[in-house]
Amino acid sequence: MDPIDAEIIKILQDDGRASNAGIESKLMVSEGTVRRRLKKLVEDEFIQIIALPDPRKMGYESQALLGVQVEPDKIGDVANNLSNLGEVNWVAITTGTYDVFAWVTLPSAEALGLFLRNDVGSIPGVRKTETFVNLDKMRGHAITI
């Protein structure tokens, strides 16, 4: 990745629907150059082109961060099991009090409770969970290039 690639990414972070022609005019390179570089950035997994819906507008009122304590020999398995659940947005294996964190989105507090008891609670190796319910989203963005 070079400075032109980084600039393409910055433009797309500001406007995910920016056209190749629009990017071309900002960077003073050909549209073909933008198209090739963008294709390579996606193929090499530097970026993903995705739509990020607003969960609340989609009817999902409950978001939470789950801290999960896991039996030491089951950390990878628990993380994989969590990542396969549709309600889970992302999973991270971490250091500290919790071995795994997962961000989840569900339609309601009741659905969150059922998810914790029925889905997370049934994963072998889970010792303890603590749920941090999101009350208000203050800011969210991708890394700045």
Protein language model features and the residues they cover:
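A compositional/biophysical signature of low hydrophobicity enriched in polar/charged and small residues
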Residues: 1-145
